[in-house]
Structures are given as structure tokens and as C-alpha cells.
Amino acid sequence: MALVGDFRQFESFFALYPSLMEVKNYLTQALTIDSAVYKRINALAGTTENTRVEFTYELGGNIRAIEQTYPLKSHTEAFYESHKKFVDFQLCVEGAEYFEVGYIKDFTPLTPYNESKDLTIYAKPITPPHRFFFHSGILGIFFPQDVHAGGLTYPIQSHTNAQDTTNITDLLTQPKKVVLKIPIEYFA
């Protein structure tokens, strides 16, 4: 079951997993304006607005931090994925994006599991997945049964003019975030 919420709400979660204290400390630094981690993530920028940039850092204990920024895409272009060996902790530091998340049994794999990438790719489900809005400070934790797609935008409809639809991309800025890859063994 995916967990999504303000990072400050996860105190009791981290209390259940003392082995994740380094993860909690790193995520705290990612949101602390004067920390080196925050400054590094906030400085991520491509040569153009539509460039994906990412850097990977080893945190120890087989935990990786992928600090990244990327252009947003329409929800119709969602890339649905899941992982077997790692749990994703995705924290938005700056900017914003939508995520779609659903239960693995509601999706049909497009590709077989790729063990070297720890990745299965899925087709868009018939049943609409849950939609979450990520902005600065929002953490999503995605377990192996959680198929997820991030970096999404949605058209919005004006409350005053039913004919007026605006792509929310115009209202969002490219996310600057971190994805922590945590081995599933930490949750056994």
C-alpha cells in the first residue's frame, strides 16, 4: 500500500523502522534550505527547460539517492512502473507534479520484469488509478505492489467558464526531487 503525505507526518513510520534513520536524516536535509543536500537538489537545471537531469549518490546500506529534475508530461503519456527489490521514497523538494498510483493486480505488464533495472512497465489500467498532487515537502513511498507514474500534468476546467480548459502545466514548475531506492529487506 502506497503512503503519501507531508514528510512531517511520517514520524511514526520512521519510528517503526530505526534502520531508516539515515534515510530520515537525508530527507530532512533535502528540505532544509541551508543544507548542502537542499542546495544541490535546488541547483539542478538542464541546459533547457525540457531537459532531464539526475545524479545518483550512494548513502550506504545499499541505499541510493537519485536527485533529479525533469519536464512534466501529459497524464496521457504516463509511464507506469513497479519494482520488486527496492521501495521508492519520492520526495518533492521544489516544483510540483501529479502521480498516478494503483494496485499491481489492476495493471497488465507491457514488459517482463527486468531484474538488472528492477523494473516492470505496465499498460494504462482500465480502472482509473489514484491521483496525488506532489509539491514541496510531499513524500510518496511506493512498495512492490504499488504501480506508479509521476511527472504528470492534467488539464483543468475553469469554475466560471465550462468552455475554458487550461493545461495545468502552465501552473506547475518542473519538479526538483529525490528518489531514494531502499532495499525491500529493510521492511522485513
Predicted regions and their residues:
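Acidic, glycine-rich flexible loop segments
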Residues: 121-129
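Glycine- and acidic-residue-biased ligand/ion/polar-headgroup-sensing regions
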Residues: 85-87, 91-101, 106, 115-122
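A short beta-loop-beta micro-motif enriched in histidine and acidic residues
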Residues: 59-60, 75-88, 107-110, 127-128
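Short, structured patches in soluble enzyme cores that scaffold and shape functional sites
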Residues: 69, 91-93, 103, 144-146, ...
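Short histidine-centered beta-strand/loop micro-motifs
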Residues: 75-83, 90, 101-102, 151-152, ...
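Conserved metal-binding segment of the jelly-roll/cupin
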Residues: 132-154
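A short, N-terminal "cap"/entry segment at the start of jelly-roll beta-barrel domains
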Residues: 1-66, 79
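A short hydrophobic beta-strand segment most commonly corresponding to one strand
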Residues: 89, 139-141, 158-188
